[in-house]
């Protein structure tokens, strides 16, 4: 029992709260995606935000243990850059082309933003993380109505980039030409 008490006493509750906040905020965005029936929903968004927060917390811990290497400081920034790159690959997996439509770009963008929310939470920037979550939720839950009515003519009358993609000439395989 003493060991368990010592274990809880040694926990870094500030860092744990950062992880919990990231999971909660990522879950809020994921809930909207889940409710909308999107490919990446509650669990995916929660895990992306939590993972980004964990890597941010690890970055802080690494900096505390290894403050500099050859007089260079900046572990924090390298990990953040790699989080963003990694999330780009996950997001790319949600983008699909169906018939003449490209789907999943909003979900890919929401995963990218959720990773930023996780990074902000991991570094303890709660105000920024919460404010961003609120704005993202409003964009996802409310702007689709505006988009639906403002872009109806563009979509259904064949104008815009999607029409350009649909009518563009497929790429030729230059390797087969002699």
Which residues make up each language-model segment?
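Membrane-water interface at transmembrane helix exits
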Residues: 33-34, 60-67, 93, 97, ...
């Amino acid at each position: 029992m003493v060991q368990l008490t010592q274990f809880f006493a040694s926990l870094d509750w500030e860092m744990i709260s950062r992880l919990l906040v990231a999971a909660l905020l990522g879950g809020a965005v994921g809930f909207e995606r889940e409710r909308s029936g999107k490919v990446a929903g509650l669990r995916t968004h929660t895990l992306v935000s939590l993972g980004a927060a964990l890597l941010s917390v690890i970055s802080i811990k690494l900096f505390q243990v290894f403050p500099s290497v050859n007089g260079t400081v900046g572990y924090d920034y390298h990990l953040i850059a790699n989080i963003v790159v990694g999330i780009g690959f996950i997001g790319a997996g949600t983008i699909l082309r169906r018939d003449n439509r490209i789907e999943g770009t909003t979900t890919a963008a929401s995963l990218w933003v959720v990773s930023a929310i996780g990074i902000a939470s991991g570094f303890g920037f709660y105000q920024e993380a919460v404010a961003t979550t609120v704005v993202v939720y409003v964009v996802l839950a409310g702007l689709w109505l505006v988009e639906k009515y403002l872009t109806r003519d563009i979509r259904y009358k064949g104008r815009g980039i999607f029409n350009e993609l649909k009518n563009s000439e497929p790429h030729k395989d230059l390797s087969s030409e002699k």
